[in-house]
């Protein structure tokens, strides 16, 4: 009986407090949490945005470009994700990596009726290099301590219930 109690306790520790990877295409969990120094990009007014200012929040960095068809496809669902109830500790940064002017990026958002997200820029592709991006869209998810724990390579439907429930575990 004592052995059974210990076994059940160990199962609870190993399985009861972890979030399993949902069956979501393109989602890759990071085996070792990654910490990056100097994660800085620009807002629409060309002011620096530093991720360290957002410690304590679940962060999503979505790298996109106006010429990217899959980016255009997923952006409305990313916009909706920012407004999901129960994810009030989530901050999403859609970061344009093409070397375009603000007007073109704003037109892209207006054309897609994006209302919950602001536009950010990595025109010098400093972050794209730092994160070793291979293409767009790529989404990087950081925990509340600023450590990368997941990536999405390619597009997904951010409105997917399995994805939202998985994200709520970290919120």
Residue map of PLM features:
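Sec/Tat signal peptide C-region and signal peptidase I cleavage site
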Residues: 14-18
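Active-site acidic short loop of glycosyltransferases
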Residues: 54-57, 87, 114-116, 133
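Structural microenvironment flanking redox-active thiols in thiol-disulfide oxidoreductases
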Residues: 73-112, 123-129
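Thiol/disulfide oxidoreductase modules built on the thioredoxin-like
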Residues: 107-115, 122-166
